[in-house]
Structure formats: C-alpha cells, structure tokens
C-alpha cells in the first residue's frame, strides 16, 4: 500500500514540476558569477559530493528498501524548489525542500540529491545554471541541509517534540540557503560604499519580504509530509533511527547508516 502511494506521490510531484515556468529566481543564474568565483564554489562543494556519494551508497547497500524513500526526498526537493512565486524587482522566491531529506538521510546525502535537483532544474527549467551549479549547490544542498540537520538534532537532544524539530529544520534550513546565496553574490559583487556587508544586506533585503513567509510555510508542509511518513512508513523511519523501534537484540534493525 505504501509503495503504491509513494509512486502516486512521485508522479504528482513530477507533474507539478513540469508545470512550473522558468523564471529568474534566487538560484544564481547561468553566467552571472565571474569565472574565478564560479570555479571556487565548485572546488568547495567537491568534498561534500564525494562524502554524499559514500553516504548514499552505504545507506542503499545496508537497506535497498530505502531507495524509494530516498527518491521521495529528492522529488520533494525538486518540486518545492521549482515552485517560484513573484517577489520584488521582478524576481522570484521559492522554497528549497531540503529539510525533509536532511532529517531523513542527513546532510551528506542531501549534497548529492540537492546537486542532482539543481542540475535538472538548470537543464529542464532554465532555473540556475551549469556554471553556477557549484555555488547553488553550496547554498541549497550543503549549508541548508547542515543547518537543518543540526537544528533537528539539537531540538531532539533538548527533548523537543518531533514536529517542532522538523519545523525548525525545514524553516531555518530554507532561510540559511538564502542568507548564503546573498553572501555569495556580495562576495562577487561588493558595493562601492560599504563593501561586502552592504551588498549582502541589499541582496537579503530583496527577497526577505517573500522568503520569510515561504520558509514558515515550508516548515508546516514538511511537518505534514513527515507525519504522513510516520503514519504509513514507520518501518523505514525506524531503520533510519528517526523513530524508536526494536533494538538489534530484539530482532530489530542494526541501524548502521552513514549520515
């Protein structure tokens, strides 16, 4: 039953993505960054891609049944980050969708899933670009997931509820993606008066009006999706050690996953 529901969910998510129209959004556009900065961000994300590949390979090898959930996390990221809403100055803002995957599989796996999502969007939706793939991956698929996963673990360690942990992870992971993108643009294009700081504040201000409510909405949506997974796919969440289950001595999973 769950697999049938998951396939239907994936189909609907991809159908929604196909209807998304290209627009200038917060992803840095093709050719916008100078060559030296574009190359710099590729070098920065390369170790995360290597780590992410190892993490995904280990997870899938340990439990092949998690492939469907991994695909769902990627589809969720693809669709949410492709839903562009009008912002000021004729640009667009959009959710990122990285919080769910970060909570489920950790930040390493999301560096790969997010990178694949950004590559497809650059090729199919004219969203972002190939030359700026490194920069966009660092902001949305590295910083965002690390912040999301770190907050999730912190809230859970402080005995916070699961819905609160997921909400904060998705919301602040989204916001930090845009803070990072603003910093990347500011480093490449510092203001004549005020330098990098002034330029960063300017870029952040452009998107703040729409991005804050979008991030909060993404937080609530991610909680809803997580609750559905907890209801209809509890076994996989137990395998990932997200929800309590039987220990290995009791016949449960060993839970040795690289996150």
Swiss-Prot record:
GO CC annotation: ATP-binding cassette (ABC) transporter complex
Q: What biological process terms from GO does the record include?
A: cobalamin biosynthetic process
Entry GO MF terms: cobalt ion transmembrane transporter activity
UniProt keyword annotations, A-Z: Cell membrane, Cobalamin biosynthesis, Cobalt, Cobalt transport, Ion transport, Membrane, Signal, Transmembrane, Transmembrane helix, Transport
Q: What membrane topology does this protein have?
A: Multi-pass membrane protein
Record's InterPro entries? CbiM, CbiM/NikMN
Keyword Transmembrane included in the entry's annotation: yes
Protein localization:
Cell membrane
- Give TM segment ranges: 31-51, 68-88, 100-120, 132-152, 160-180, 206-226
Q: Which Pfam families match?
A: CbiM
Signal peptide start and end residues: 1-25
Highest taxon in the source lineage: Bacteria
Its annotated pathway reads: Cofactor biosynthesis; adenosylcobalamin biosynthesis
Please describe what this protein does: Part of the energy-coupling factor (ECF) transporter complex CbiMNOQ involved in cobalt import.
Record-stated family: Belongs to the CbiM family.
Subunit structure comment from the entry: Forms an energy-coupling factor (ECF) transporter complex composed of an ATP-binding protein (A component, CbiO), a transmembrane protein (T component, CbiQ) and 2 possible substrate-capture proteins (S components, CbiM and CbiN) of unknown stoichimetry.
> NCBIfam families, from UniProt?
cbiM, PRK08319.1
HAMAP family, A to Z: CbiM
The protein's name: Cobalt transport protein CbiM
Organism equals Moorella thermoacetica (strain ATCC 39073 / JCM 9320)
This protein's gene is called cbiM
């Amino acid at each position: 039953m769950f697999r049938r529901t998951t396939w239907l969910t994936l189909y609907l998510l991809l159908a929604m993505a196909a209807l998304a129209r290209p627009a200038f959004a917060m992803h840095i556009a093709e050719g916008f960054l100078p060559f030296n900065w574009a190359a710099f961000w590729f070098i920065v994300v390369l170790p995360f891609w290597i780590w992410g590949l190892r993490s995904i390979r280990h997870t899938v090898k340990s439990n092949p049944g998690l492939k469907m959930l991994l695909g769902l996390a990627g589809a969720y990221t693809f669709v949410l980050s492709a839903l562009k809403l009008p912002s000021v100055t004729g640009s667009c803002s959009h959710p990122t969708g990285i919080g769910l995957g970060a909570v489920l599989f950790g930040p390493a796996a999301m560096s790969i899933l997010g990178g694949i999502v950004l590559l497809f969007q650059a090729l199919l939706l004219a969203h972002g670009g190939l030359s700026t793939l490194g920069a966009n991956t660092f902001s949305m698929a590295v910083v965002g997931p690390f912040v999301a996963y770190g907050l999730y673990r912190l809230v859970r360690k402080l005995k916070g509820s699961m819905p609160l942990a997921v909400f904060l992870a998705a919301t602040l992971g989204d916001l930090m993606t845009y803070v990072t993108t603003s910093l990347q643009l500011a480093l490449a294009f510092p203001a004549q008066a005020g330098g990098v700081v002034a330029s960063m504040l300017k870029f952040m201000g452009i998107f703040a009006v729409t991005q804050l409510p979008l991030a909060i909405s993404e937080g609530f949506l991610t909680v809803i999706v997580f609750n559905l997974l907890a209801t209809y796919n509890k076994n996989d969440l137990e395998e990932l050690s997200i929800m309590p289950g039987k220990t290995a001595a009791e016949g449960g999973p060993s839970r040795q996953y690289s996150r």
